[in-house]
């Protein structure tokens, strides 16, 4: 009897350390799998830069920043953002509208995003890095405890387990970018997402979907990037899309053909 009880408790403990199946489905309603872009349609430069962005490059992460400075009306310039970077001092954040800027300019904000220097236009030349979105309000946006986001992942229709620690946030309202950066890093590490076929990059198409209980879902074609360099590859985050982290989960669909 004691052995049976111990076995049951061990099973429960192991289950809680991985992402459960949460309101998932084997196919996304947002984008048909046949419409997903194939990895072979990306140029080699773009594929290499996607790998660099999501796996190797450090991210801009900070809390409780404030700035009234701008370069253009759809930007906010954070002077002295980098304190120990080899090249950059300032961070120029670009949004797709002035309305978004007005929500954050002069307010206490938190930042989490992928930044780049090559082809960054604005600020002090060679001393300013650029980033699209990645901004949330600081005040009254902190969870009482860190949120670990459950992930459902299917590879060619077969569900694979994803550790529950893979994607997490301490924010009530979080940018999709923050969650997406963490998820794609895992996909690169586990599945060589942005490797070429020669270097064991077996995944040929993919879709990531961010679901919440109260808002429309947000989805990205994992190989749907435009252009070759960070200034265009990262433009999907320019809308600074945020979602409520409560009762949310992520669905990922990967295909090897």
Swiss-Prot record:
Zn(2+) binds at residues 211, 249, 251. This toxin seems to be coded by a bacteriophage. Monomer. Interacts with MHC class II molecules alpha/HLA-DRB1 and beta/HLA-DRA chains. The interaction with MHC-II molecules occurs at both zinc-dependent and zinc-independent sites. Interacts with T-cell receptor beta variable 7-9/TRBV7-9. GO terms for molecular function: metal ion binding; MHC class II protein binding; toxin activity. Binds 1 zinc ion per subunit. The zinc ion is necessary for the toxin interaction with MHC class II. This is Enterotoxin type A. Belongs to the staphylococcal/streptococcal toxin family. Staphylococcal enterotoxin that activates the host immune system by binding as unprocessed molecules to major histocompatibility (MHC) complex class II and T-cell receptor (TCR) molecules. In turn, waves of cellular activation, cytokine production, and migration into the lung tissue and airways occur via alphabeta T-cells. Also causes the intoxication staphylococcal food poisoning syndrome. The illness is characterized by high fever, hypotension, diarrhea, shock, and in some cases death. Changing residue 211 to A: Almost 10-fold reduction of the binding to major histocompatibility complex (MHC) class II. It is found in: Secreted. Keywords: Disulfide bond, Enterotoxin, Metal-binding, Secreted, Signal, Superantigen, Toxin, Zinc. Residues 1-24 form the signal peptide. Its cofactor is Zn(2+). Its main location: secreted. Disulfide bonds join 120-130. GO terms for cellular component: extracellular region.
